[in-house]
Design a protein with these regions (language model features):
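The conserved phosphate-sensing helix
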Residues: 1-3
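Accessory nucleic acid-recognition modules appended to NTPase machines
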Residues: 5-180
Length: 181
């Protein structure tokens, strides 16, 4: 889509392509998923923007469905991760090496792998994203975090986050050249 826009400067054509990709995501959820997991996967996928709009972006199953629990949606989340549509960023209890050893498997955030598709999914325009738009300002913080996660991930970093008991948070913790950042 980026190349298409660079060549054509046509937002409508790009949005059509994005809509086609989003439709293929939904088709893949039906085609390559267990029958009893299709609805759960779609519910989880549709709920990602709700999760990103929350001040506390830690993933909450109860936001997918009232009374939702990990046991009900963990396969759906795993399918979305394995398909490359989303990524999980785990909370670490301590910022020590190796980070993987200190992750809390029950506390994580979910980010999408393509922000352009996220905007298309929610029918957001470039102006919505670039300029102050009170209707979506809560969502912009989650989008900014999502953007940082994508950039770190495409540069080969495994991302984690840390949160204190009182709520202070470091949005991203990575290991670079043997150092924790």
């Amino acid at each position: 889509c980026v190349m298409q826009f660079a060549q054509t400067k046509d937002y409508i054509l790009v949005r059509h392509t994005q809509d086609t990709i989003l439709a293929s995501y939904l088709n893949d959820m039906s085609k390559y998923n267990n029958l009893n997991e299709i609805k759960k996967t779609r519910l989880a996928y549709d709920n990602i923007t709700v999760q990103l709009s929350k001040k506390n972006t830690r993933f909450q199953y109860k936001l997918i469905k009232k009374g939702g629990r990990a046991s009900e949606f963990e396969n759906a989340i795993e399918w979305l991760c394995l398909s490359g549509i989303v990524s999980q960023v785990y909370k670490v209890e301590q910022i020590k090496k190796p980070l993987e050893n200190y992750r809390d498997i029950d506390a994580f955030k979910i980010y999408v792998s393509d922000l352009g598709l996220l905007c298309a999914k929610k029918d957001l325009t470039a102006d919505d994203v670039l300029y102050e738009t009170p209707e979506i300002n809560d969502f912009k913080g989650g989008m900014a975090e999502n953007y940082v996660n994508v950039q770190l991930s495409i540069n080969g970093y495994r991302t984690y986050y840390w949160q204190s008991e009182r709520g202070a948070e470091i949005d991203f913790v990575i290991q670079r050249d043997g150092k924790l950042i």
